From Swiss-Prot:
Homotrimer. Forms a ternary complex with ANK2 and ITPR3. The complex is disrupted by agonists. Interacts with KCNA4. Interacts with KCNA2; cocaine consumption leads to increased interaction. Interacts with RNF112 in an oxidative stress-regulated manner. Residues 99-106 are annotated as: Important for ligand-binding. Belongs to the ERG2 family. Residues 1-9 are lumenal. This is Sigma non-opioid intracellular receptor 1. The lineage of its organism: Eukaryota, Metazoa, Chordata, Craniata, Vertebrata. One of its GO terms (cellular component) is cytoplasmic vesicle. Residues 2-8 are annotated as: Targeting to endoplasmic reticulum-associated lipid droplets. The gene is SIGMAR1. Coiled coil: none annotated. Residues 177-223 are annotated as: C-terminal hydrophobic region. The record marks D126, E172 as: Important for ligand binding. It comes from the Eukaryota. Residues 31-223 are cytoplasmic.
């Protein structure tokens, strides 16, 4: 009995050590990456269009991002609004850029929604174009409310409760281990809604982003 208990402790210690090593390797890898976008750059661009009709704001933002970062934003024919079910909430996203370490997307909800933010190996910032974003941070007893032009930052490993009012739309930038965010983003789709067409759309959008980055890396911005 004691021998079996000892083995369990050994395995637990080994798993914790492996997790610690993996975490260190991941952050060392991120430290070697050269990033296309910056958090403040995306936030400043989004703030320019805060308060406008969200569709007009998004169209202008896309034009500006393509001007500043040619070869890194998906073309119009590959942009698609896709439902996202995660953490008990429902929204929609339109992916503009994706790689192994970054993404830029448009996100929001026409009806309003609330749920769990998820925990990620990534830092995520959302700059609000319209509507309201309520955030209740873990370990606190009060929530915060963010309005158009303000930026909400979600740090690596953090968890919050989130709530968006009707017609809340924002620009989101994520930096970190982006494939690790897919498990949370797709869990409700796989195990709850079982909307496998949406699952396909989501994976296709990410694959398109990776393909664009690979093509730009190999052949340059004009490919």
């Amino acid at each position: 009995m004691q021998w079996a208990l000892g083995r369990r402790w050994v395995w637990a210690a080994l798993l914790l050590a492996a997790a610690a090593v993996l975490t260190q390797v991941v952050w060392l890898w991120l430290g070697t990456q050269s990033f296309v976008f910056q958090h403040e750059e995306i936030a400043q661009l989004a703030r320019q269009y805060a308060g406008l009709d969200h569709e007009l704001a998004f169209s202008r933002l896309i034009v500006e991002l393509r001007r500043l970062h040619p070869g890194h934003v998906l073309p119009d024919e590959e942009l698609q609004w896709v439902f996202v079910n995660a953490g008990g909430w429902m929204g929609a996203m339109c992916l503009l850029h994706a790689s192994l370490s970054e993404y830029v997307l448009l996100f929001g909800t026409a009806l309003g929604s609330r749920g769990h933010s998820g925990r990620y190996w990534a830092e995520i910032s959302d700059t609000i174009i319209s509507g309201t974003f309520h955030q209740w941070r873990e370990g606190t007893t009060k929530s915060e409310v963010f309005y158009p032009g303000e930026t909400v930052v979600h740090g690596p490993g953090e968890a919050t409760a989130v709530e968006w009012g009707p017609n809340t739309w924002m620009v989101e930038y994520g930096r970190g281990v982006i494939p690790s965010t897919l498990a949370f983003a797709l869990a409700d789709t796989i195990f709850s809604t079982q909307d496998f067409l949406t699952l396909f759309y989501t994976l296709r959008a990410y694959a398109r982003g990776l393909r664009l980055e690979f093509t730009t890396y190999l052949f340059g911005q004009d490919s």
